[in-house]
Amino acid sequence: MSKTHQKVVLIGDGAVGSSYAFAMVQQGLAQEFAIIDLNKKRTEGDALDLEDATPFTAPKLVYGADYDTCKDADLVVITAGAPQKPGETRLDLVDKNLKIIKSVVEPVVKSGFQGIFLVAANPVDILTYAVQKFSGFPRNKVVGSGTSLDSARLRVGLSKLFNVSPVDVNANMMAEHGDTEFAAFSSATIGGLPLYDLAEAKGISKDDLYKLEDDVRNKAYAIINSKGATFYGVATALMRISRAILRDENAVLPVGAPMSGEYGLKDIYIGTPAVINANGIAEVLEVPLDEREAKAMADSAKTLEEIAKNGMAKIQG
């Protein structure tokens, strides 16, 4: 990965993709930003619109492109996929989005791309797994957005409950980016203090925390029911992961990471903190879990494994 000229390709110029493109331009990340979508007229329009923002941020070449452009990219970000509609769960999207992902990954690999994949299309844990299988890439070079957005939602909720800044909250949602996710409260801290100790001192009960966990789990549905889709939060989460990759930060972020025995799991992508740098996932950090959390992780993994197995069997067979 070049330090002087970095290239990012976005595949999927819908609400999430275009919001991500805007976030990347605002942050001045990468010198070249290409956008691929079936709707080429939209990508051309977005590229022209984003180009007008570059004098206020940093010089950047922004343009609509095709898959051949991926050849020398450092990072390919996939947001393409059918959106989650009101009343749908993320797992309801499996079959149709697996087909879309397969149609995307094959031409990217054919182009000669050798960089990092970052996946955000839902259900993201299963689609990240599928990208790795379809591409044949080393597992560290395929990263899912995982529970990055969910963890941000948890930190915002805890910041309100404890009346502190969310930047001083260190807490993660883990497992599926979806209905079986859970809050790892036992390892959470606020200002370096264990969350449970601080909660007890402030008279905040575990029931209060579990209610917050449920609110976080359902926040996406509230947003979708109000405005039709979520995109600003996840786009910013994608920008943060991209920054860690492009700047080789060794940042610890909650992402969709491949399991190699962590939490007793193998051959699955699931939400957990990991070290992110120019190589993608440099290290998976196995967070100590209490009994409640360990059961939730195992149950979530079982759900993902079953759906991934069935979905991949359909598309491959």
Swiss-Prot record:
Record keyword Amino-acid biosynthesis present: no
EC number(s) on file: 1.1.1.27
Annotated binding of NAD(+), by residue: V16, D37, R42, Y67, G81, A82, S103, A120, A121, N122, S145
Source species: Limosilactobacillus fermentum (strain NBRC 3956 / LMG 18251) (Lactobacillus fermentum)
GO terms assigned for molecular function: L-lactate dehydrogenase activity
Chain residues that bind substrate: Q84, R90, N122, P123, V124, D125, D150, S151, A152, R153, T230
Subunit comment: Homotetramer.
GO cellular component: cytoplasm
The protein's name: L-lactate dehydrogenase
